[in-house]
Design a protein with these regions (language model features):
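Enriched - but not universal
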Residues: 43, 57, 97, 211, ...
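Intrinsic disorder/low-complexity segments
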Residues: 1, 396-426
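Flavin (primarily FAD) cofactor-binding/catalytic cores of flavoenzymes
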Residues: 2-37, 80-181, 185-398, 426
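Flavin (FAD/FMN) cofactor-binding and adjacent substrate-gating region
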Residues: 42-75, 234-255
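Generic low-complexity, intrinsically disordered sequence content enriched
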Residues: 21, 27, 53-54, 63, ...
């Protein structure tokens, strides 16, 4: 008979690890599947810097003991601001050592419904029963490939999530498609790696975030000495003043009347933008704005021919698609068809209720798939606290339960340490 666990978490990124921390602190039995921070480590470009502020980059734990500051102290090394990708990955892996030292690195190949819960099949053939399943596997399957690039081989056109080391493009001509942080930072990294780069942006202009750009007003407003800073900028600081507070409080954001208005507010909060500290690194990179790729064709030897909406042609060695992600949970390969048939969805997103529970009792979704129901905060690390607290509360107190009795564990949870106790070293 297959082993039974109260809660299975699929995914060991920020959302999965934060949820494990909160559930274990609540005494709920949990089993976490996945490799800690795998997407961040393998599918984000080397050399990347986090755009989010320091206070918006902590992975949430119940006692606020496992912050970036705590990681700095435990590792005896300072973490630069902005936070480099490799340091954030190391922080997340350290966080995982504290809250999920028993992390199960096996991949989940399939999740099927059962009468009192779910059956999970691992890639190595093991069968595990779980009362609840938390899907926290991130956005990797949702990489958006624009229609002109359909059928183009990955050697000629790839998504930013498919290329972690830009040094392979040294000496080659690369067109970066997009106008947000991913596109602009990728262009800077490519240029610094020795590539000949052009950025092609559909929008008429690039929206620059002034963080780090040298703006004295911006620095003064964000200074900890500014007495009105808490009134202007919540810790997450997503979107312009005013809207940023709605985004920071999903319970308020979801009260915005009509889905259409909420959608406009969300798009305004997370519109494509680049950090101000990127501008000096792009001085020698040509940026063509107000132009879209309308056709792409392999040819000219091993090169790619791009037809642009302004009537011009580019022939490049590679097109790097910084074109974002389009959530569609049907693209999670492990969800069985019978689960998907019972899943109420809105444009690819699961419709979620209290505790981030879907229309399939006991099946929860975290991260970007929760953004339709709880707002754009769920797309960022800053949302881990709200999500993990809400899910842990619902599971502990049986809000919209699955019918499977969630049992409290008999042993103490992994050390969720207080500041005066010794942390596991990185």
């Amino acid at each position: 008979m297959a082993a039974t666990i109260p809660v299975a978490i699929i995914g060991a990124g920020p959302y999965g690890l934060a949820t494990a921390a909160h559930l274990r602190a609540a005494g709920v039995g949990v089993h976490v599947f996945g490799e800690a921070m795998a997407f961040w480590e393998r599918q984000m470009p080397a050399g990347m810097l986090l755009r989010s502020y320091w206070d918006a980059s902590h992975i949430a734990d119940p006692n606020h003991d496992l912050t970036l500051d705590a990681y700095e102290a435990a590792s005896h090394t300072a973490v630069p601001r902005p936070v480099p990708l490799e340091r954030f990955v190391a922080y997340g892996q350290w966080f995982g050592q504290q809250v999920a030292p028993d992390l199960d690195q096996r991949q989940i190949a399939r999740v099927e419904p059962e009468t009192d819960g779910f059956r999970l099949m691992t890639a190595d053939g093991a069968s595990i029963r779980a009362g609840r399943v938390v899907v926290a596997t991130g956005i990797a399957p949702f990489a958006c490939r624009p229609p002109p690039f359909a059928g183009i081989a990955p050697a000629l056109a790839s998504h930013t999530a498919e290329c972690g080391d830009f040094r392979v493009f040294a000496g080659r001509h690369v067109a970066v498609i997009g106008g947000g942080q991913s596109a602009l930072e990728s262009a800077a990294l490519l240029h610094e790696a020795g590539a000949d780069v052009e950025v092609i942006v559909r929008a008429a202009e690039i929206h620059w975030l002034r963080y780090g750009s040298g703006s004295q007003l911006h620095a003064a407003l964000h200074s900890d000495r500014n007495p009105v800073k808490p009134l202007l900028f919540p810790a997450s600081d997503i979107g312009p003043p005013g809207l940023n507070y709605l985004v920071d409080k999903p319970a308020l954001f979801t009260k915005i009347p009509t889905r259409a208005i909420r959608g406009r507010a969300a798009r305004r909060a997370i519109r494509p933008a680049g950090s101000g500290w990127l501008r000096p690194r792009l001085r020698d990179v040509p940026i063509t704005m107000g132009t879209a790729v309308i056709a792409a064709k392999a040819g000219c030897g091993d090169r790619l021919r791009l037809a642009l909406s302004d009537g011009t042609i580019r022939t490049v060695d590679h097109a790097l698609l910084a074109t974002g992600y389009a959530v569609d949970v049907a693209r999670y390969p492990f969800l069985a068809p019978e689960l998907l048939r019972g899943l109420d969805r809105i444009a690819g997103y699961p419709r979620l209720h209290a505790g981030f529970e879907s229309s399939v009792p006991g099946l929860h979704f975290l991260g970007a798939p929760a953004a339709e129901s709880f707002g754009p905060l769920m797309r960022f690390v800053a949302g881990t606290g709200y999500a993990a607290r809400g899910l842990a509360h619902a599971v502990k107190f049986g809000v919209r339960g699955s019918g499977f009795e969630v049992r409290r564990t008999g042993s103490a949870p992994p050390e969720l340490v207080s500041p005066n106790r010794e942390l596991r070293t990185p």
